[in-house]
Regions:
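Iron-sulfur-associated redox domains of electron-transfer enzymes in respiratory
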Residues: 1-160
């Protein structure tokens, strides 16, 4: 019968196993997607109905209008662990509420300046247009965003 000292000598160092696992671990970003109810969310439905495959890294939040997305929602998403955020709006001129998507564009521009102040790359916050009939475009935007955020790596944000 072996004594406990000889058993321990033959066991691999668990600390090195953890470090090896971290090196081989593939980064899968967490992305929050804010989708307009009238266009982008319907585009997502179309993609789903057509059984289009896209990255599961995006958690969708349906909003009635992209113009109602408060910049604080985006900051909260990053503060709570999101590596990226998407805002998907109606195409210009197609907003159900007339001007909501224009308001969203203006807020996004201001938000990018704010993110820069916090050291967050602007590529982590994508704004794009997807209409109700653009299921394929929805899939492309999702997959492009996930790949862009993967290249950036995990968001390193300092919490208070």
């Amino acid at each position: 019968m072996k004594n406990s000292a000889s058993i321990m000598e033959n066991m691999p160092d668990s600390g090195s196993n953890i470090e090896e696992a971290k090196k081989t671990e593939v980064f899968e970003p967490r992305i929050i997607g804010f989708l307009c109810n009238w266009c982008s969310y319907a585009g997502a439905d179309k993609a789903g109905a057509a059984q289009k495959h896209y990255s599961p890294n995006v958690s969708v939040i349906k909003v009635m209008c992209s113009g109602r997305i408060d910049p604080q929602f985006i900051m909260d998403a990053f503060q709570n662990g999101a590596d990226g955020v998407m805002i998907l709006a109606c195409h210009p001129g197609d907003c159900h509420y007339k001007e909501g998507n224009y308001r969203a564009v203006q807020r996004h521009r201001l938000l990018l300046r704010l993110l820069k102040q916090f050291g967050i790359e602007e590529e982590r916050c994508r704004f794009d247009y997807v209409s109700a009939g653009e299921g394929d475009r929805f899939v492309s935007v999702i997959n492009e965003t996930v790949e862009a955020v993967k290249k950036l790596g995990p968001l390193k944000i300092i919490k208070n």
